[in-house]
């Protein structure tokens, strides 16, 4: 289901970065787009979001999440919980196949259609087909270098694209906070 992308988020030193590759894969055999942007700034530029999964489903979830952010006046956790409640109980939305990584200056959250809203202990999170590779790389970089959040996201995505056939080297990164 989640083949075709890697999204990684890192929080470090007052900076939060989310990045993703640009590959869109049709089925398991055909790359149909190389330069997709799967990362967005939401809520007046104060929230970052990235998706893995079906593109149309993710756009539906982005729109719904943005509405929940407005309703909660930018409270990331409340908006995420409200999104999951709606996602799980609505007959149409329940069928959507995507995951979101969202972040503000304070936290990074994973939001899934199975009801999870998870905040990592270490300020590092990744999803998608190359997510495990990017997560391992980001954790190593955060523990053994002085790189910024943006640089860690970039480097971990580069490592993931060298390993995962569903991840490419067209990388988009957005940040909030920092210098």
Swiss-Prot record:
Gene3D superfamilies: Glutamine Phosphoribosylpyrophosphate, subunit 1, domain 1
GO molecular function, one term: metal ion binding
PROSITE patterns: PROTEASOME_BETA_2
UniProt xrefs under CDD domains: protease_HslV
Active site: 5
Keywords associated with the record: Allosteric enzyme, Cytoplasm, Hydrolase, Metal-binding, Protease, Sodium, Threonine protease
EC assignment: 3.4.25.2
Catalytic activity: ATP-dependent cleavage of peptide bonds with broad specificity
Subcellular location as annotated: Cytoplasm
GO cellular component, one term: HslUV protease complex
Main location: cytoplasm
UniProt-listed InterPro entries: ATP-dep_Prtase_HsIV_su (IPR022281), Ntn_hydrolases_N (IPR029055), Proteasome_sua/b (IPR001353), Proteasome_suB-type (IPR023333)
Subunit architecture: A double ring-shaped homohexamer of HslV is capped on each side by a ring-shaped HslU homohexamer. The assembly of the HslU/HslV complex is dependent on binding of ATP.
Function: Protease subunit of a proteasome-like degradation complex believed to be a general protein degrading machinery.
Protein name as annotated: ATP-dependent protease subunit HslV
Species assigned in the record: Carboxydothermus hydrogenoformans (strain ATCC BAA-161 / DSM 6008 / Z-2901)
Lineage: Bacteria, Bacillati, Bacillota, Clostridia, Thermoanaerobacterales
């Amino acid at each position: 289901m989640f083949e075709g992308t890697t999204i990684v988020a890192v929080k470090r030193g007052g900076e939060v970065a989310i990045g993703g590759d640009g590959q869109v894969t049709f089925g398991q055999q055909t790359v149909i787009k190389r330069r997709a942007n799967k990362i967005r700034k939401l809520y007046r530029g104060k929230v970052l979001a990235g998706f893995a999964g079906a593109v149309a489903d993710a756009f539906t979830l982005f729109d719904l999440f943005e509405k929940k952010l407005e309703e909660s006046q930018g409270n990331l956790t409340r908006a995420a919980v409200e999104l999951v409640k709606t996602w799980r109980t609505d007959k149409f939305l329940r069928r959507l196949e995507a995951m979101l990584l969202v972040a503000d200056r304070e936290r990074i959250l994973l939001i899934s259609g199975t009801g999870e809203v998870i905040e990592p202990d270490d300020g590092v999170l990744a999803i998608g087909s190359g997510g495990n590779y990017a997560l391992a790389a980001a954790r190593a970089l955060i523990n053994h270098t002085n790189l910024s959040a943006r640089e860690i996201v970039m480097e971990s995505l580069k490592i993931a694209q060298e390993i995962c056939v569903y991840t490419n080297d067209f990388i988009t990164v957005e940040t909030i906070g920092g210098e």
